[in-house]
Amino acid sequence: MSTPRRYHITTFGCQMNKADSERMAGILEDLGYIWSEEANDADLVLYNTCTIRDNAEQKVYSYLGRQAERKRQQPDLTLIVAGCVAQQEGESLLRRVPELDLVMGPQHANRLADLLAQVEAGSQVVATEEVEIAEDITQPRRDSTITAWVNVIYGCNERCTYCVVPNVRGREQSREPAAIRAEIEQLAAQGYREITLLGQNIDAYGRDLPGSTPEGRHLHTLTDLLYTIHDVPGIERIRFATSHPRYFTERLIRACAELPKVCEYFHIPFQSGDNDVLKAMARGYTVERYLRIVEQIRDIIPDAAISADAIVAFPGETEEQFENTLKLVEQVGFDLVNTAAYSPRPGTPAANAPNQLSEEVKQDRLQRLNHLVAQMAADRSQRYLGRTEEVLIEATNPRNPQQVMGRTRTNRLVFCDGTIAQLEGQLVPVRITETRAFSLTGQILSPVAAGC
């Protein structure tokens, strides 16, 4: 009996990439491969790549160089680059790393088995053409047994001037509601408690599907999808990401308030707190529009948590315009902001814009914004002190094996004493005893805590 071939996947970038990696891992295991913790022990190495920022892209090339050297010594090694760098670079990757066997864009993740068959037949394969994304019936190899990603829409039709995503992930393609519900029902049967609906621009869900209502709305929207999946037995929590302010609606907020399984957490990038910068970014909304969304959320769901993304030092951004971003962060009081200094990406209009800012300015503004974000997050955390929060226990605290960790409905990370063997996958009441900017510590109040 032959020894099973081993595979290793390294994933860079966003939640969409993580979900794609889980699907590709499932395909490989369906083909008989087994997981290897170490890339150097694997017979197949796959890098699922991100090109949103230059440093992530350069890290990929560093990893690839090491595996290319290994393949020269071990010709049977299968070397694959998937994801956004693969889509962006295409055949030029083969010139840069001729040891590669397969270059495949994100739209081809579900076709990995077919593409591998071509590789095994002796071909060096580049799969970056735009295709209809096929439904995948293979079981993903998910990183968690408690929470799961569920892709509902692929691609993006927006044309933000700094962003390469539409170029590498293609046009928007929504999955049918019935297929999404079927996947969630399967997850529930496997014991999953929480699902996160994923889309690069999830508020665009359904606008490419046929049909409209008598009122002129799209027949299928994210709001309608939440109602479609909400009653799946066994699923206790529903989240979604990432929202776009241009398409975010009050109807969606009211649905979230009405549906008890939908968590009180919204991730809505604002990117800049200055209208002129937003216009240069082609974001399609104003600061005032963003603040109205925040106001609506807090009017309808007062305890909701709001997180965001922000970019500093966009080409031509003045000190005054940057300070407008600081003002917005202070005014909203976000629970979390993912921050980044602007990084020019090939093929985007902003990369060729005049007035590119220096690295010194970028790092100064990033540091100042991060300081304010942490301060605001610490202030927001204070409201949890002494409260009892429902926490879904997911794992052992990697820094303290005597503790478990999980998340509140508002997505705050919580640590508490206990053993994962007893608590994994449980929704437990936790009294919060300590707060920090981005995490909480508490004490489990349920009877199960007595055995911890």
From Swiss-Prot:
E.C. numbers: 2.8.4.3
Free-text comment on the cofactor: Binds 2 [4Fe-4S] clusters. One cluster is coordinated with 3 cysteines and an exchangeable S-adenosyl-L-methionine.
Chain positions recorded as [4Fe-4S] cluster 2 binding sites: 156, 160, 163
Keywords, in A-Z order: 4Fe-4S, Cytoplasm, Iron, Iron-sulfur, Metal-binding, S-adenosyl-L-methionine, Transferase, tRNA processing
CDD domains (UniProt xref): Radical_SAM
Cofactor: [4Fe-4S] cluster
Catalyses which reaction(s): N(6)-dimethylallyladenosine(37) in tRNA + (sulfur carrier)-SH + AH2 + 2 S-adenosyl-L-methionine = 2-methylsulfanyl-N(6)-dimethylallyladenosine(37) in tRNA + (sulfur carrier)-H + 5'-deoxyadenosine + L-methionine + A + S-adenosyl-L-homocysteine + 2 H(+)
Function: Catalyzes the methylthiolation of N6-(dimethylallyl)adenosine (i(6)A), leading to the formation of 2-methylthio-N6-(dimethylallyl)adenosine (ms(2)i(6)A) at position 37 in tRNAs that read codons beginning with uridine.
Protein family per UniProt: Belongs to the methylthiotransferase family. MiaB subfamily.
Name of the protein in its database record: tRNA-2-methylthio-N(6)-dimethylallyladenosine synthase
Gene source species: Synechococcus elongatus (strain ATCC 33912 / PCC 7942 / FACHB-805) (Anacystis nidulans R2)
Gene it is expressed from: miaB
